[in-house]
Amino acid sequence: MKTYYSNRARIYEEVYFREDPIRQAELIEIKDVLKEKLAGKNVLEVACGTGYWTQYVAETAQHITAIDYSEEVLTIAKEKQLLSSKVSFVQGNAYKLNQLTKTFDGAYANFWFSHIPKENIFSFLEKFHVVLEKGSIVCMADNMYNEEIGGTLISKINDENTYKIRSLADGQQYEIIKNYYSKEELTAIFEPFATDLEIHMNTCFWFISYKVK
């Protein structure tokens, strides 16, 4: 996973500019909701990638600590030259967030949740919530399943995860975890950690928000 996204870093943001009016409208809605809900917050961003979402949330957040494991994507994120008083880009492991030395009252992770192996979800969420204060606002967004986009969804025997093959321009191919969820599944996953849980299942993307218990 890290190798794929590191090698794809320079073209990663192309996924946000597909000429699909429904897709574009939903992306705008996600941006607007993030900016509204995280306004004035000290925010943790998990798997920030190239800083695409960071640049919008920084418009209203008090400060963002944006974490990613890949040096390559962080280099591109830093090229956006966001104010250091507003954003700190940090190389870090999303599965070891409990090692952070500060806490936050807001957090988000966009287009990361689908890449978490299902057997690691609870561990990730436990460590994620360790660094969030009670009442913190959390937002997440990810893809709805569309069989016409992204190639064949691969299932394996005795494996609850699903996978897709991703190809780069130079011909390299990578098999990555890509899991999709129903509203009922998302409810069951997040309810133990959440109050005021809101789940929106749209055409292209799902979006959730909640307050930390």
Task: Please name every model-derived segment.
Residues 122-134:
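A short glycine-rich, Lys/Arg-flanked "PGG" loop and its adjoining helix->strand segment in the class I
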Residues 111-112:
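Short catalytic micro-motifs in class I SAM-dependent methyltransferases
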Residues 1-38:
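Conserved class I S-adenosyl-L-methionine
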Residues 50, 174-211:
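Conserved Class I S-adenosyl-L-methionine
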Residues 44, 48-96:
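Class I SAM-dependent methyltransferase SAM/SAH-binding core
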Residues 108:
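A conserved beta-strand element that flanks and buttresses the S-adenosyl-L-methionine
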Residues 141-189:
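C-terminal alpha-helical "lid/dimerization" subdomain adjacent to the S-adenosyl-L-methionine
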